[in-house]
């Protein structure tokens, strides 16, 4: 999974910073300092893919690339108000290939906005290999990357890391988490899909 990379990235995220995540933001919430009981309550209430914690300046969207323009607007507002906070915008590799991402990076670069984009590349758009969607010959290689990598502004402002999905229970690996069992003694059995 991507736990190691996220732990490293969140060492640079401050409590006053703003975070915008994707539909897979459970760990992001915990690393931002949101109490696990609050995160778990939202997940169990059916809000797993759109976690919102305004008191912690944390927002997420289940729409691919949906958080990009909102994060960009937040960064623009912070700059206009002269505030010292930074915006952290997380997206997947498929979102990073969209026009919304390319435009957000270009606008942030042009106006030197306080935003860091983090591309979490697992080679998939939900379950479709990203490189096949765009006709790119190799996994973890993208066409859009060549655009923003040419800007010196992007150094440290566009972070891209790759990871492979492992055997942890989540969509696409054939295992699911049974939340009816949360808080009960583990049985040692896994539920296969």
Stretches found by the model and what they are:
Residues 2-111, 132-136:
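Cofactor-binding active-site loop characterized by glycine-rich and histidine/acidic residues
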Residues 111-193:
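Thiamine diphosphate
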